[in-house]
UniProtKB/Swiss-Prot annotation:
<comment type="similarity">
    <text>Belongs to the FBPase class 1 family.</text>
</comment>
<dbReference type="InterPro" id="IPR044015">
    <property type="entry name" value="FBPase_C_dom"/>
</dbReference>
<dbReference type="GO" id="GO:0000287">
    <property type="term" value="F:magnesium ion binding"/>
</dbReference>
<dbReference type="InterPro" id="IPR033391">
    <property type="entry name" value="FBPase_N"/>
</dbReference>
<feature type="binding site">
    <location>
        <position position="94"/>
    </location>
    <ligand>
        <name>Mg(2+) 1</name>
    </ligand>
</feature>
<feature type="binding site">
    <location>
        <position position="116"/>
    </location>
    <ligand>
        <name>Mg(2+) 1</name>
    </ligand>
</feature>
<dbReference type="GO" id="GO:0030388">
    <property type="term" value="P:fructose 1,6-bisphosphate metabolic process"/>
</dbReference>
<comment type="pathway">
    <text>Carbohydrate biosynthesis; gluconeogenesis.</text>
</comment>
<feature type="binding site">
    <location>
        <position position="282"/>
    </location>
    <ligand>
        <name>Mg(2+) 2</name>
    </ligand>
</feature>
<keyword id="KW-0460">Magnesium</keyword>
<dbReference type="GO" id="GO:0042132">
    <property type="term" value="F:fructose 1,6-bisphosphate 1-phosphatase activity"/>
</dbReference>
<feature type="binding site">
    <location>
        <position position="210"/>
    </location>
    <ligand>
        <name>substrate</name>
    </ligand>
</feature>
<comment type="subunit">
    <text>Homotetramer.</text>
</comment>
<dbReference type="GO" id="GO:0006000">
    <property type="term" value="P:fructose metabolic process"/>
</dbReference>
<feature type="binding site">
    <location>
        <position position="276"/>
    </location>
    <ligand>
        <name>substrate</name>
    </ligand>
</feature>
<feature type="binding site">
    <location>
        <position position="118"/>
    </location>
    <ligand>
        <name>Mg(2+) 1</name>
    </ligand>
</feature>
<dbReference type="Pfam" id="PF00316">
    <property type="entry name" value="FBPase"/>
</dbReference>
């Protein structure tokens, strides 16, 4: 690709703003700030042990999970980058118990930013792809945010995206008008458009699930996976492959590129907790992206983006990816009225 003919993220967003007239300037600027923060996170991730940021921080987040040093650093990078620009009323992070209002000494805007600063951080020390997930909502209360301001269904998202820090660093974005992927050119420091209007195939022969939990699954999931594992001799009449990276951004990025279904169901170990993934920080933004790419995303019983949040750290079961497979496993839940 000729350097002169490259489309950078900034150019792409400005053209979107001109052509569609549904991308406000403040939202465009907010997305660019998030993308710059992801570049800074990518730089720190890539330094590895040389950056003295590997290992645990000796603390736990609100989820009760041990925090990695890079979890905390990534969270701080996103907060510091976005607090002063005048585009936001508040932010909420998977790593923080309560939301973060924009300090009084900075101007406030009309948007809310929700993020998982470093998804898949258990993989940091073993050099497996990890990433950042984010979602943007409008603040319904003008510029004075409360926790309730964030509790909007995913259908209210105005933008969502993720960055993957892997062999390449990529930034995947939707503003409700398709899904596009930008690759970080480290030589010039720009995000360059490398994939336009990404589409997930409706059919697939790949699935992603943590099979070590099989003994805990509810019957609809057990039935679905058993059929896949039966291969050509089973009811599906075809062979399926399992892929599991244990990093949602990496698994979803693969599915976005070549199809597949990602599953993180509820299970019998914690019947009072419906799933592990967080609705606001992971499930909603990924569902927005997947649906914009022609896929589907459900909890097994309803469309993820129609779930009404009841708390910042609410968890949900997740089934997303190739439309026909998501519809099949969702249908099994309906037949069994199970989880």
């Amino acid at each position: 690709m000729s350097i002169a003919r490259r489309t950078t993220l900034s150019k792409f967003l400005i053209e979107q703003q001109r052509e569609t007239n549904n991308l406000p300037a403040d939202l465009r600027l907010l997305i660019e700030v998030v993308a710059r923060a992801c570049k800074a996170i990518s730089y720190n991730v890539s330094k590895g042990a040389l950056g003295e940021a590997l290992g645990t921080a000796g603390s736990e987040n609100v989820q009760g999970e041990v925090q990695k040093k890079l979890d905390i650093l990534s969270n701080e990078i996103l907060l510091d980058a976005n607090e002063w620009g005048g585009n936001l009323a508040a932010m909420a992070s998977e790593e923080m118990e309560t939301f973060f209002p924009i300090p009084a000494n900075y101007p406030r805007g009309e948007y809310l930013l929700v993020f998982d600063p470093l998804d898949g951080s258990s993989n940091i020390d073993v050099n497996v792809s990890i990433g950042t997930i984010f979602s943007v909502l409008r603040c319904p209360d003008g510029k004075q945010a409360t926790e309730e301001s964030f509790l909007q269904p995913g259908t209210e998202q105005v933008a969502a995206g993720y960055a993957v820090y892997g062999p390449q660093t990529v930034f995947v974005l939707t503003t409700g008008n398709g899904v596009n992927c930008f690759t970080l050119d480290r030589e010039v420091g720009s995000w360059v458009l490398t994939q336009s209007n990404m589409q997930i195939p409706a059919d697939t022969r790949e699935y992603a699930i943590n099979a070590s939990n099989a003994r805990h699954w509810y019957e609809p999931v057990q039935r679905y996976v058993d059929e896949l594992n039966a291969g050509k001799d089973g009811p599906r009449g075809d062979n399926f492959n399992m892929r599991w990276i244990a990093s949602m951004v990496a698994d979803v990025h693969r599915i976005l590129n070549r199809g597949g279904i990602f599953m993180y169901p509820a299970d019998k170990r914690t019947p009072d907790r419906p799933g592990k993934l967080r609705l606001m920080y992971e499930a909603n933004p990924m569902s927005f992206i997947v649906e914009q790419a022609g896929g589907a995303a459900t909890t097994g019983t309803q469309r993820i983006m129609e779930v009404q949040p009841t708390g910042l750290h609410q968890r949900v079961p997740v089934f997303l990816g190739s439309k026909n497979e998501v519809e099949r496993v969702t249908g099994y839940h309906a037949e069994g009225e199970g989880k």
